[in-house]
Amino acid sequence: MDKFNVKTYNSISHLGLEKIKHVGLSIDSDKNANAILLRSHKLSIDEIKESVHGIFRAGAGTNNIPIDYCTSKGIAVFNTPGANANAVKELVILSILISSRNIFRAKNSLLKIGDLPTDQFKVEVENLKKEFVGTEIKGRTIGIIGLGKIGSLVAESCISLGMNVIGYDPVISVESAWKLPSAIVRASSPEQLVELSDFISLHLPLNSSTKNIFNANLFSKINKDAVLLNFARQEIVDEKVLDTYLKSKKLKYYVTDFPSPEFLSLDNVISFPHLGASTSSAEENCAIMSGEQIIKFLLDGEIFNSVNFPDTTLKRESSYRLTVVNKNTPNMVGQITSVLAKYGINIHNMINKSKGDLAYNILDLDSSINDQVLNSLININGITKVRYIPNE
């Protein structure tokens, strides 16, 4: 009999699914799910049943998942940062090249003269050659806003291509900053970065502080010959202001992976249909990483790369493992251990980690526990979820 069940939405690479099945987990959309695995599916609250312990996004963005609701129910939400970073980076580099050489404008102009007589066609080709003179990217400056997995890879590639790189990331960790190439020049503000850049590439997550972050203020600093690249999230750019700058030719190109119908006819917009992570390698990497997360979480309660829970690992030293999700308030651990002591349950080892208002505990016990113990724990004010994960 299968121990846990995983429900999938979207097409998930078989490499990730096989990893899940290999350890005895089932993948059945008709059964109650203990874990949900998805890509771009917009998950509704109604689809999250009481049996769900974790939701796993095979990709980086999690704005298609109701995270606040999940947190309130003690449900961990995971993503796979970095698994598709190389795929997105390659499309960004391609976009820098095609925009600097006017590739699409030149191609579209060729289509218009295809029916001309041969001699006239050759003349027009030479005229187009003069019309679409491009620029080389060597020696040009790219400003990168957001220096996470993707932004740092873009920076490395641009440096290797001879570009000057300016970076800005107000929330970068010390550890991540140490990993950045030393050639990156740090901007003191996004305004300074925009003013100095020939290309501006956005690599930020979407949240309340980044929505419309590229606003009228930043657009007012942009060079009319600059190229703005958005491979992060559509809502990061204020499209009302963008529309004005595009139609008044105050921006050379806007290149994006998030097409808008109103911009498709503009010759200074290059749109792709969400191709950033759409490579077989990226999809496989995301599925494999998600599979590994599901296995560790369902079988051992361990967490890595969660957006709402702290990374928490504890080497299993007992067949009787308990996990507890609670509000991050004083004396919660004391109340948990008091209940276990009341029932004569000894703690072999444990770890307690917190993230914001939430705390997560893994406890290895010296003996098994019954429903009476679990009910006593879940009835503690401030505890949102309790799981008993025996390994017998």
What are these regions (language model features)?
Residues 1-81, 195, 215, 238-240, ...:
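An N-terminal-biased, well-structured beta-alpha scaffold segment characteristic
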Residues 6-8, 144, 324:
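Hydrophobic Val/Ile/Leu positions in short beta-strands of Rossmann-like dinucleotide-binding domains
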Residues 44-46, 170-263, 278:
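Rossmann-like adenosine-cofactor binding region
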Residues 81-141, 305-307:
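Phosphate-binding beta-alpha-beta segment of Rossmann-like dinucleotide-binding domains, i.e.
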Residues 89-108, 158-163, 289-302, 337-341, ...:
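Oxidoreductase and adenylate-handling cofactor-binding alpha/beta cores
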Residues 150:
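Hydrophobic/small residue at the entry helix of a nucleotide-binding pocket
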Residues 220, 224-316, 327, 360, ...:
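Rossmann-like dinucleotide-binding domain for NAD(H)/NADP(H)
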Residues 304, 308-392:
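A conserved regulatory-domain signal marking ACT and ACT-like small-molecule sensing domains
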